[in-house]
């Protein structure tokens, strides 16, 4: 398994974790099928993942890791830049995988660990940096999504209880995570709400957002969307 740490800098060491998988048809963005074909959905997700990884590398933090299912490892090693650390998910279910990833990075000596998904290609660096800075005087940072989940979570110590008793992939994820954090007595900072591109209406919102954003935002996603438009015209 490839494991490439970022450069060690004086002072605080920060790690960004990205939950992702290889862009394989039938395994990624299945809720966009239809209207997309499995191949189109996988190609679009490839753009999402590459843009999220580029965003992470642009932060200049000491490590960017992609937390992935076992079957994705070799494919991601071929797709992603060598500066990216690949971390195979462990345990049973998403909660165990997130707990293990946070615990491992904190044990490696990182002072701040922030995790994002790979479903929001227009996300900017601002909420990630805000989440990291907030950990100076909070125990947990979190970014809610419009559908009741969260797209970001960060911590400076292993408060792994926040990943317990969560009904993952439901509209209750954010509320249950917050309830767990408050039950543990954690000080929580919430960054602004954002959205994941999971359903066809989200895809339309993404298209609209990209029209108003600078052309340098989400370049890989733009290329994938252009391919979709060309396919639609040809049919």
Specify the residue positions occupied by each region the protein language model found.
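Acidic donor-binding segment of Leloir-type glycosyltransferases
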Residues: 62-85
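A short, N-terminal amphipathic alpha-helix
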Residues: 43-61
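Catalytic metal- and UDP-sugar-binding loop of GT-A-like glycosyltransferases, i.e.
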Residues: 116
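Conserved donor-nucleotide/metal-binding helix-loop-beta segment in metal-dependent transferases, i.e.
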Residues: 123-147
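Short, glycine-/small-residue-rich phosphate/pyrophosphate-handling segment
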Residues: 159-180
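N-terminal nucleotide-binding beta1-loop-alpha1 segment
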Residues: 2-3, 7-31
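Short phosphate-binding loop-to-helix
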Residues: 78-113
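Conserved alpha/beta core of the MobA/IspD/sugar-nucleotide pyrophosphorylase nucleotidyltransferase superfamily
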Residues: 176-235
């Amino acid at each position: 398994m490839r494991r490439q740490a970022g450069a060690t800098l004086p002072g605080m060491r920060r790690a960004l974790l990205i939950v992702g998988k290889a862009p394989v048809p039938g395994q990624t963005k299945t809720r966009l099928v239809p209207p997309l074909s499995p191949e189109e959905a996988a190609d679009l997700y490839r753009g999402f993942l590459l843009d999220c990884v580029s965003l992470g590398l642009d932060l200049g933090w000491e490590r960017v890791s992609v937390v992935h299912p076992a079957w994705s490892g070799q494919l991601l090693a071929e797709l992603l830049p060598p500066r990216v650390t690949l971390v195979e998910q462990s345990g049973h279910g998403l909660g165990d995988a997130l707990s293990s990833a946070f615990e491992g990075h904190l044990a490696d000596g990182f002072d701040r660990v922030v995790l994002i998904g790979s479903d929001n290609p227009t996300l900017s660096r601002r909420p990630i940096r805000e989440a990291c800075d907030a950990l100076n005087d909070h125990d947990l940072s979190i970014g809610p999504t419009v559908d009741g989940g969260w797209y970001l979570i960060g911590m400076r110590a292993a408060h792994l209880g926040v990943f317990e008793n969560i009904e993952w992939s439901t509209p209750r994820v954010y509320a249950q995570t917050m309830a767990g954090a408050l039950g543990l007595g954690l000080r929580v900072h919430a960054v602004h709400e954002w959205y994941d591109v999971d359903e066809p209406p989200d895809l339309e919102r993404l298209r609209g957002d990209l029209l108003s954003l600078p052309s340098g935002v989400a370049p890989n996603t733009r290329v994938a969307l252009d391919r979709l438009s060309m396919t639609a015209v040809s049919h």
